[in-house]
UniProtKB/Swiss-Prot annotation:
Pfam families: Ribosomal_L27A (PF00828). Keywords: Ribonucleoprotein, Ribosomal protein, RNA-binding, rRNA-binding. InterPro entries: Ribosomal_uL15 (IPR030878), Ribosomal_uL15/eL18 (IPR021131), Ribosomal_uL15/eL18_sf (IPR036227), Ribosomal_uL15_bac-type (IPR005749), Ribosomal_uL15_CS (IPR001196). One of its GO terms (cellular component) is cytosolic large ribosomal subunit. Belongs to the universal ribosomal protein uL15 family. One of its GO terms (molecular function) is structural constituent of ribosome. Residues 21-31 have a biased composition (Gly residues). This is Large ribosomal subunit protein uL15. Residues 1-10 have a biased composition (Polar residues). One of its GO terms (biological process) is translation. The gene is rplO. Part of the 50S ribosomal subunit. Binds to the 23S rRNA.
Length: 146
C-alpha cells in the first residue's frame, strides 16, 4: 500500500457540492453565480489588482527603497573550510581558487564554525570575533586591509 492508494473511510467525508444539478441540490439554475453580470458569464474574469478602471492601489502608492545586491555577493566561510586552501595566506583569490566560494562572490566573512588546526594568515576578508580568536589560537594572524 502506498500513500496515493489511501482513501478515507466511507461516510467520513461529505460529498462535493455539484453545481447546476437541479433546484433540490441547493445549487441549481444559476449554480451559485447569481443573476447577470460579469461573474455570472463564462469567461467572466479580471486580473488580480484590477479595480474597474480606477487607478489601482499598487500604482497609487509611491515606490520606495531598493534591494541591495551586496547580500547576493557575500559568502560565509567556516573555519574548517579554510583548511582546504593551499598555502599560508587566505584571501578572496585563494578562496576562489580552492573552490570554497563561487567566482561571483565579492565579499567573504569567516565565521567561527568548526575548528582550524594550522596557522594561516587571513587578509582582505572580514572575520568575526570568535573566528579571529580561533585563528590566532592556532598560531595564525588576521591582517586588516583598509
Amino acid at each position: 500500500m502506498r500513500l496515493n492508494q489511501l482513501s478515507p473511510s466511507a461516510g467520513s467525508r461529505p460529498d462535493a457540492k455539484r453545481a447546476g444539478r437541479g433546484a433540490g441540490s441547493g445549487l441549481g439554475k444559476t449554480a451559485g453565480r447569481g443573476h447577470k453580470g460579469q461573474h455570472s458569464r463564462s469567461g467572466g474574469f479580471h486580473k488580480v489588482g484590477f479595480e474597474g478602471g480606477q487607478m489601482p492601489l499598487q500604482r497609487r502608492v509611491p515606490k520606495y527603497g531598493f534591494s541591495s545586491q551586496k547580500g547576493l555577493r557575500t559568502a560565509e566561510v567556516r573555519l574548517h573550510e579554510i583548511a582546504r586552501v593551499d598555502g599560508d595566506t587566505v584571501d578572496l583569490a585563494a578562496l576562489h581558487k580552492a573552490g570554497v566560494v563561487r567566482k561571483n562572490m565579492r565579499y567573504v566573512k569567516v565565521i567561527a564554525s568548526g575548528t582550524i588546526d594550522r596557522a594561516v594568515s587571513v587578509r582582505g576578508v572580514k572575520v568575526t570575533q570568535g573566528a579571529r580568536k580561533a585563528i590566532e589560537a592556532a598560531g595564525g594572524q588576521v591582517v586588516e586591509e583598509g
